[in-house]
């Protein structure tokens, strides 16, 4: 019986902690959601521009190396 409790107790504690976490979580309000969405959009745009410029720079370099 003691061995069974050794396996059951960590699971029980995990479920208890998970329920407590879900109860404490709150949905963001409209202003907070817009701020997070704007920050994410700006991050995507910056990464896109970086990728575009890296590609733009490496195309001519690749053509010179390959000898096109």
Curated annotation (Swiss-Prot):
Keywords on record: Endoplasmic reticulum, Membrane, Protein transport, Translocation, Transmembrane, Transmembrane helix, Transport
Transmembrane segments: 33-61
Residue intervals on the Extracellular side: 62-68
Gene3D superfamilies hit by this protein: Preprotein translocase SecE subunit
Pfam families in UniProt: SecE (PF00584)
Any one of the GO CC terms: endoplasmic reticulum membrane
InterPro entries in alphabetical order: Prot_translocase_SecE_dom_sf, Translocase_Sec61-g, Translocase_SecE/Sec61-g
Cytoplasmic-side positions: 1-32
NADP listed as a keyword: no
BP-aspect Gene Ontology terms: intracellular protein transport; protein targeting to ER
UniProt GO molecular function: protein transmembrane transporter activity; ribosome binding
Cellular localisation: Endoplasmic reticulum membrane
Protein task: Component of SEC61 channel-forming translocon complex that mediates transport of signal peptide-containing precursor polypeptides across the endoplasmic reticulum (ER). Forms a ribosome receptor and a gated pore in the ER membrane, both functions required for cotranslational translocation of nascent polypeptides.
Subunit organization: The SEC61 channel-forming translocon complex consists of channel-forming core components SEC61A1, SEC61B and SEC61G and different auxiliary components such as SEC62 and SEC63. The SEC61 channel associates with the multi-pass translocon (MPT) complex.
PANTHER family tied to this protein: SEC61 GAMMA SUBUNIT (PTHR12309)
Family membership noted in the UniProt record: Belongs to the SecE/SEC61-gamma family.
Name used for this protein in its record: Protein transport protein Sec61 subunit gamma
């Amino acid at each position: 019986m003691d061995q069974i409790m050794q396996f059951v107790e960590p699971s029980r504690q995990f479920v208890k902690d998970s329920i407590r976490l879900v109860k404490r979580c709150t949905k963001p309000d409209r202003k907070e959601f817009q701020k997070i969405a704007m920050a994410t959009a700006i991050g995507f745009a910056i990464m896109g521009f970086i990728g575009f410029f890296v590609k733009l720079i490496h195309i001519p370099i690749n053509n010179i190396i390959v000898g096109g």
